[in-house]
């Protein structure tokens, strides 16, 4: 029976363009998993959206001379366009300024407050008398209290790496006006996370976590402390009965997964449909993030959910990536270590990029994108193994007049059957890799199947069989090779969907009925592809090159 699967990726911050690190970490893995689960025939909903509040947005909007809403509107569109260009198959891309978000965030707060999990406290914060407002860390710079570097940020020193509170800076000043700042008392609401340690530990024991982060998550939960969830800003979700305060972005943003699903349901004129995913325990909920977001998704948001009387679905699996670097350094547009995605796609095909990002995904440790590795993988793997297998078989078939290939049991020899059995086993291996969220291993399975096909075609040498007048054997070999290609397209589709579709188009297998499929959301195909192949017929069309050499 099909499963209902909810997939979410960390909401991208509407404060700048996306780069390869974002895509390889949280969005391509989620897209690949969504495509895989759709292939299995499951009821999949992939929700994402723009995170549109927070200090960094107000700071950069002011620097750009733009209104806050105008600024986030710009990046909401940019991000959506980027995901579309990259083939990230998000079912609905919402935003935290959606019409459902404000009330839902305030309801979360009110419920937590009523249960004694939120209390107000007085604290000292940096205040600009010239600007007449409190300034949070992103607005502040000064002298690092650890190394003495002048120009350190309000939350960490970019020179020595120390982290601290903005109030620890020596000679703090406003980034906007340059004015000196003073300490002034202010009141904030604090979420008492330390009161949720036991239920959080019990919950996290039931949740899939990559083994390399489980200890970190457990230790983090055991050491939870009260955390301020309000800010002195004008841009954000207003806090009920607390004048001039808005919610800290990391209190409101995760609730955007729920409000975004409400937004999706409303867009379909089925306003209650969100409940099928968020209020049904049978839903399988998988969350994809980068490692810098682990505390918020593994502890803070689950604590907020546990504090609600409405039984919102909590994640069943947290898939966290490590950092993805560019030539060994962090992506940084301001420091010139950056690749513009649009410019890159003007030169290289989308599936080349998707494949290399998947093959080098930072799953258990930091990894990097390098142009040399990109070139090597494209030329050696995509062209030399994958593309070569597809092209040589189909060109040989066309050149020698084989347009219709049908199964014939009496023509298959033992080596053919062994080849097909091994091909099907690799498909089952790929299914296991996708189920365990490993893009790297899935890429290895793809190349293993392509290599298997190449070896089989070489060993059978149909060009020799043709010279010997054994056309019946040639037909059997071509059928087996094309069946392998059909399976190769299947296991490739989650990662390189455009290429997989092109293979299916050239093979025109009777079993697929391509006209009835949605190219961008192929569904319910995986198990059917592994069924008995005895009724399959291929109607071959003119072969096209799938990949070209990268110079």
Curated annotation (Swiss-Prot):
Residues that hold Zn(2+) according to the record: 144, 147, 157, 160
Subcellular locations according to the entry: Cytoplasm
Keyword Cytoplasm among record annotations: yes
Quaternary structure and interacting proteins, as annotated: Monomer.
Annotated organism of origin: Chlamydia abortus (strain DSM 27085 / S26/3)
GO molecular function: ATP binding; metal ion binding; methionine-tRNA ligase activity
GO biological process: methionyl-tRNA aminoacylation
Broad class of where this protein is predominantly found: cytoplasm
Statement: the UniProt record of this protein carries the keyword Protein biosynthesis: yes
Domain of life of the organism encoding this protein: Bacteria
Reactions mediated catalytically: tRNA(Met) + L-methionine + ATP = L-methionyl-tRNA(Met) + AMP + diphosphate
Residues noted as binding ATP in the record, renumbered to the chain: 333
Encoding gene, per UniProt annotation: metG
Residue window of motif 'HIGH' region: 12-22
Pfam families reported for this sequence: Anticodon_3 (PF19303), tRNA-synt_1g (PF09334)
Ranges spanned by the short sequence motif 'KMSKS' region, renumbered to the chain: 330-334
Known function: Is required not only for elongation of protein synthesis but also for the initiation of all mRNA translation through initiator tRNA(fMet) aminoacylation.
Protein name per Swiss-Prot or TrEMBL: Methionine--tRNA ligase
Family statement drawn from the similarity comment of this UniProt entry: Belongs to the class-I aminoacyl-tRNA synthetase family. MetG type 1 subfamily.
InterPro entries xrefs: Anticodon_Met, Met-tRNA_ligase_1, Met-tRNA_synth, Methionyl/Leucyl_tRNA_Synth, MetRS_core, MetRS_Zn, Rossmann-like_a/b/a_fold, tRNAsynth_Ia_anticodon-bd
Cofactor binding remark: Binds 1 zinc ion per subunit.
């Amino acid at each position: 029976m099909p499963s209902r699967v909810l997939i979410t990726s960390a909401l991208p911050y509407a404060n700048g363009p996306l780069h390869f690190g974002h895509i390889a970490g949280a969005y391509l893995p989620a897209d690949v998993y969504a495509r895989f689960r759709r292939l299995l025939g499951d009821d999949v909903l992939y929700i994402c959206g723009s995170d549109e509040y927070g200090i960094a947005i107000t700071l950069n909007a002011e620097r750009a001379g733009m209104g806050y809403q105008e600024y986030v509107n710009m990046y909401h569109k940019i991000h959506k366009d980027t995901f579309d260009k990259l083939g990230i198959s998000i079912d609905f891309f919402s935003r935290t300024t959606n019409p459902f978000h404000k009330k839902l965030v305030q309801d979360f707060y009110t419920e937590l407050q009523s249960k004694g999990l939120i209390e107000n406290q007085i604290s000292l914060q940096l205040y600009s008398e010239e600007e007449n407002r409190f300034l949070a860390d992103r607005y502040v710079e000064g002298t690092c209290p650890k190394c003495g570097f002048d120009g350190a940020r309000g939350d960490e020193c970019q020179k020595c790496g120390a982290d601290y509170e903005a109030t620890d800076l020596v000679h703090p000043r406003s980034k906007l006006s340059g004015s000196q700042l003073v300490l002034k008392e202010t009141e904030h609401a604090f979420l008492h996370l330390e009161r949720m340690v036991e239920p959080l530990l019990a919950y996290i024991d039931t949740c899939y976590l990559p083994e390399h982060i489980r200890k970190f998550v457990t230790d983090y939960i055991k050491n939870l402390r009260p955390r301020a969830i309000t800010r002195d800003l004008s841009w954000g979700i207003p806090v009920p009965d607390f004048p001039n305060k808005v919610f800290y972005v990391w209190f409101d943003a995760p609730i955007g997964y729920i409000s975004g699903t409400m937004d999706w349901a409303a867009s379909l004129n089925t306003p209650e449909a969100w409940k099928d995913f968020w209020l049904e325990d049978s839903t399988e909920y998988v969350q994809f993030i980068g490692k810098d977001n682990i505390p918020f998704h593994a502890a803070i948001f689950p604590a907020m959910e546990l504090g609600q009387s409405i039984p919102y679905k909590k994640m069943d699996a947290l898939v966290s990536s490590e950092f993805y670097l560019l030539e060994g350094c962090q992506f940084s547009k301001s420091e010139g270590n950056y690749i513009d995605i649009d410019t890159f796609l003007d030169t290289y095909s989308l599936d080349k990029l998707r494949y290399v990002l998947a093959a080098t995904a930072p799953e258990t440790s930091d990894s990097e994108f390098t142009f040399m590795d990109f070139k090597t993988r494209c030329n050696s793997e995509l062209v030399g193994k994958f593309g070569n297998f597809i092209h040589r078989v189909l060109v040989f078939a066309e050149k020698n007049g084989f347009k219709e290939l049908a199964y014939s049991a009496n023509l298959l020899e033992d080596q053919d059957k062994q080849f097909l059995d091994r091909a099907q086993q690799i498909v089952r291996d790929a299914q296991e890799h996708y189920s365990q969220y490993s893009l790297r291993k899935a890429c290895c399975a793809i190349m293993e199947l392509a290599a298997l096909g190449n070896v089989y075609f070489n060993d059978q040498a149909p060009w020799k069989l043709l010279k010997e007048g054994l056309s019946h054997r040639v037909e059997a070999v071509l059928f087996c090779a094309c069946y392998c290609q059909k399976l190769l397209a299947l296991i490739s589709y989650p990662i390189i969907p455009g290429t997989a579709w092109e293979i299916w188009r050239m093979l025109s297998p009777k079993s697929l009925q391509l006209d009835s499929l949605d190219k961008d959301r192929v569904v319910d195909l995986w198990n059917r592809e592994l069924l008995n192949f005895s009724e399959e017929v291929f109607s071959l069309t003119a072969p096209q090159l799938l990949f070209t050499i990268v110079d």
